[in-house]
Swiss-Prot record:
KW Glycoprotein (keyword) present: no
Gene that this sequence comes from: flower
Family: Belongs to the calcium channel flower family.
Assembly and oligomerization: Homomultimer. Associates with the dally/ magu complex.
GO CC annotation terms, alphabetical: cell projection; endosome; presynaptic membrane; synaptic vesicle membrane
Site (Calcium ion selectivity): residue numbering on this chain: 81
Name of the molecule in the record: Calcium channel flower
Domain of life where this protein originates: Eukaryota
Subcellular location: Cell membrane; Cytoplasmic vesicle, Secretory vesicle, Synaptic vesicle membrane; Presynaptic cell membrane; Endosome
């Protein structure tokens, strides 16, 4: 068993389907890397949320509320990414399975929306780092929702079928001249001599 298979076995859930949402298949390192980033980000969000809650000593109510929201966001992300951490709560697996059935952009939007309020309420290193990791997890899930880019041959074929305006290419031959412009009737600049309207003053 290779190292990659061991890592994917540790991060896989029991009875997990290949791609329940029917979206594009993501590479294994991106799929399990996003899950690992979510788990680590949730842990640090809980930890730094607790640090923000302790700011009640300085009578900062906005940081107290931001810390509570950050801790709740950390618990939600931890429950969705690693439901094995909440074995005592029966509904966590059901909630995680329901979210796995939804498209990946739904999870990306949820994580980004959970991460933003603590940063705006109490801007500091604790809220920036804790919620920033959850936001980064949402960004990775958003990239996975976009899917793989096309092969180089497919992109080349698509570029040859359309011109600069996005319309179908006309019968004019494409030019690779250095002096070619976007506008077909444009006159080149004169590189020798003065401009015709120059008064030479």
């Amino acid at each position: 068993m290779s190292f990659a298979e061991k890592i994917t076995g540790l991060l896989a859930r029991p009875n997990q389907q290949q791609d329940p949402a029917g979206g594009p298949e993501a590479p294994w390192y991106l799929k399990y890397g996003s899950r690992l980033l979510g788990i680590v980000g949730a842990f640090f969000a809980i930890l730094f949320g607790l640090w923000n809650v302790l700011s009640i000593i300085t009578l900062s109510v906005s940081c107290l509320v931001a810390g509570i929201i950050q801790m709740i966001a950390g618990f939600v992300v931890m429950a969705l990414e690693a439901p094995c951490c909440f074995v005592c709560i029966d509904q966590v697996n059901v909630m995680a399975d329901k979210l796995d059935a939804k498209p990946m952009y739904f999870r990306a939007g949820l994580y980004c929306a959970l991460a933003v309020p603590p940063i705006f309420m109490c801007f500091g290193l604790a809220s920036l780092f804790g919620s920033g990791l959850i936001f980064a997890t949402g960004v990775v899930y958003g990239m996975m929702a976009l899917g793989k880019k096309a092969s180089a041959a497919d992109m080349r074929a698509a570029a040859q079928q359309t011109d600069y305006g996005g319309n179908a290419a006309t019968s004019q031959a494409a030019t690779t001249s250095d002096r070619a412009g976007i506008v077909n009737n444009a006159q080149p600049f004169s590189f020798t001599g003065a401009v015709g309207t120059d008064s030479n003053v």
